């Protein structure tokens, strides 16, 4: 018997991976908006948490777990390709090597911090969304989406910034950066929440899915359990 492929799930999974890869590349640029200094990755990275909310809400934690691991694998793959490309000798007539290396030649410390923070933050986001859905019997999606994002984004920032920049940037400045990132990412979630609600309702109607994670295993390694 053939297993039906959910088109909305597939499209959200693709968008999730694209957002993660784009965020990693955009992180190399520091921007200033209204006097606040952040990385350009802030433009797209919160979208991955919104997609994670949608997937966990509609298809449950197990499907979210699959997408999170696929995002990790694709990010790792792109990072490795970038490091290989940086290691290869540049053509003598090409003068863009320094700029290319700046974008793709991320230090191992930053790579490890980024991937670890992504895994922990994303899994916490999906877990909180799943458990709160059970506890509330599916009510109060807005509150669940906001709180799961706050938990996930906080964990992500608490792991990434000290792991990537501890000892390089003063701890007081790191703390300020972390607080700003958490606040802005959470505000991002709140501002786009009306769109998220409509998307979730539309997907539930089109796909006919509304999973409650009763009696499942929340072990992050059980990828085959979907």
Regions found by a protein language model. Give the residues of each.
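Hydrophobic transmembrane alpha-helices
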Residues: 1-72, 76
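Membrane-interface interhelical connector segments
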Residues: 84-107
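Pore-lining and gate-forming transmembrane alpha-helices of multi-pass membrane transport proteins
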Residues: 148, 176-189
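Extracellular/periplasmic helix-loop-helix junctions in multi-pass membrane proteins
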Residues: 32, 161-180
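Short aromatic-rich membrane-water interface segments that cap or initiate transmembrane helices
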Residues: 39, 43, 99-113, 180-181
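Short, highly charged, low-complexity non-transmembrane loops/tails of multi-pass membrane proteins
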Residues: 200-226
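Alpha-helical transmembrane segments and their lipid-water interface positions
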Residues: 27, 31, 78-86, 121, ...
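Internal alpha-helical transmembrane segments of multi-pass membrane proteins
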Residues: 135-154
């Amino acid at each position: 018997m053939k297993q039906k492929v959910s088109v909305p799930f597939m499209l959200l999974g693709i968008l999730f991976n694209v957002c993660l890869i784009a965020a990693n590349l955009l992180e190399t640029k520091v921007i200033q908006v209204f006097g606040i200094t952040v990385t350009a990755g802030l433009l797209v990275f919160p979208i991955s948490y919104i997609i994670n909310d949608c997937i966990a809400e509609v298809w449950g934690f197990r499907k979210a777990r699959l997408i999170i691991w696929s995002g990790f694998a694709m990010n790792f793959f792109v990072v490795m390709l970038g490091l290989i490309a940086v290691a290869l000798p540049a053509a003598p007539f090409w003068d863009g090597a320094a700029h290319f290396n700046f974008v793709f030649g991320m230090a191992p410390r930053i790579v490890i911090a980024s991937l670890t923070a992504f895994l922990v933050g994303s899994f916490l986001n999906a877990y909180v969304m799943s458990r709160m859905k059970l506890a509330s019997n599916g009510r109060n999606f807005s509150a669940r989406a906001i709180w799961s994002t706050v938990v996930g984004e906080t964990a992500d920032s608490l792991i990434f910034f000290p792991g990537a920049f501890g000892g390089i940037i003063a701890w007081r400045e790191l703390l300020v950066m972390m607080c700003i990132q958490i606040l802005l990412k959470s505000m991002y979630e709140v501002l786009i929440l009306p769109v998220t609600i409509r998307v979730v309702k539309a997907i539930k109607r089109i796909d006919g899915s509304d999973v409650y994670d009763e009696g499942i295993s929340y072990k992050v390694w059980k990828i085959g359990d979907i």
